[in-house]
Structure formats: structure tokens, C-alpha cells
Amino acid sequence: MDLKNFDISNGEAGIELTILDLDNKPTDIKIKLLCLHGKKGRAALINLVKNDKASTAHILAALTTGWSGIAQDGKELKFSPEAAEKLYEGYPIIAAQVEKFIEDARNFLKK
């Protein structure tokens, strides 16, 4: 088997996930994520563990590099690591989709 079948280097720049609504239909929400299995993802995880901040929301926020299409009270919600952590803590349906996406290395394979 060719090693290119294991190349997750796309995850170093981040891959965009489209969030689904409760009917499993795509929304306008796009979240850019690092691969948990890549160098940057592992470094972020190690840093969180060292600083004793290993909650799920912290981990997901550390692997999030940006987003679009998210509004709160009719205003665009600007990305920041702190805003990402609050998003994941307050909206478990979004957090669950992000968690499932980053756990699957196939989402980051180079095509």
C-alpha cells in the first residue's frame, strides 16, 4: 500500500467542516479545524495538558483556526479561541459534530 494513503498533511493548514442542522442538512456555518493526529494538533493538545486545561471544549477550541457563518443575536460572531471555547460549551450539538470530525483522520487525508 502506498504511504500517500496515510498522508494527513492537509490537516496542518486546517480543513473546513460544514455544520449540519437537526435535519442533517448543511448550514452556512463553516468551521476550520486542525487534524488531531497532525503535528500542530498534537502540539495544541500537549500544551493544554501541560496547562491542565484538557476539557473537551478547550481541546476543540485549540484545534479550531477560524469560522464563518456564525451569528449571535443577529450579529456576526467573530472567531477567537475564547469564543470557540464558549461556542463548544454552549452548543453541544455543534461540539459533537466537530469532535466526530477531528477524530476521523480520513477527513484530513490528502486527495
Question: What does each model-found stretch correspond to?
Answer:
Residues 13-24:
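Short acidic-hydrophobic surface loop/beta-edge motif
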